[in-house]
Amino acid sequence: MALVVKGKVNINEFIDLSKSEKLLPSMFTPVKSVMVSKVDKIMVHKNESLSEVNLLKGVKLIEGGYVWLVGLVVSGEWNLPDNCRGGVSVCMVDKRMERADEATLGSYYTAAAKKRFQFKVVPNYGITTKDAKKNIWQVLVNIKNVKMSAGYCPLSLEFVSVCIVYKNNIKLGLREKVTSVKDGGPMELSEEVVDEFMENVPMSVRLAKFRTKPSKRGPKNNNNLGKGRSGGRPKPKSFDEVEKEFDNLIEDEAETSVADSDSY
């Protein structure tokens, strides 16, 4: 069965265009060219994967110009029988950013029992046409507790974006026109579904772990480290220890930012 975005992508959900901006020629308005991309599709075969996704598929870019990624609609469908256990985390990533917490644009968690799902992310930032041609966006997928034999596809994802292309730096004021944007870092979108699935590792931590390659060097000989002196250098913490501390911090202090989501 083909996976489709529910209805037509509504630009007004992401950009609040005035009547004059809809009617006047582009030279008289700050908004030059609003476009909706073609659908890009990913078939998920592995429990954990980091795949490139073309969020500007079919968008006509301006040479030497810019593109502003305003909004993104992600649709998913489980290719499973009804009432299966488990779930998935889907995280949008800007691969240019080296710090994992800054690379994550938004994440979404849902159970496999919910056969179809759809959510929206509002990245609200611009890049150069040159960078856009390098296909800088990725999707990190983590499927948990779904028991399917290797080689099959438990989940399909599709992506459609709303963007603005322009030749020169866009006029001040457009940011204020983009709706549903909140301060406070990456958005975390969450479904209120109770199943045998629970996301317990922040997606930025999971991305950092996924990006890290095992060291080819052997362990250092630290037998004499700190002996005979009280001011020895402390032993570096393992990833699991840092991850545990991060989880405790999230539970104690962090507050999940809920953005618009739509399921069908």
Swiss-Prot record:
InterPro entries: TMV_movement, Viral_movement. Residues 210-264 are annotated as: Disordered. Residues 237-247 have a biased composition (Basic and acidic residues). The keyword Plastid does not apply. Keywords: Host cell junction, Host cytoplasm, Host cytoskeleton, RNA-binding, Transport, Viral movement protein. Residues 210-219 have a biased composition (Basic residues). It is found in: Host cytoplasm, Host cytoskeleton; Host cell junction, Host plasmodesma. One of its GO terms (biological process) is transport of virus in host, cell to cell. Its main location: host cell. The keyword Cell division does not apply. One of its GO terms (cellular component) is host cell plasmodesma. Belongs to the tobamovirus movement protein family. This is Movement protein. It comes from Tomato mosaic virus (strain LII) (ToMV).
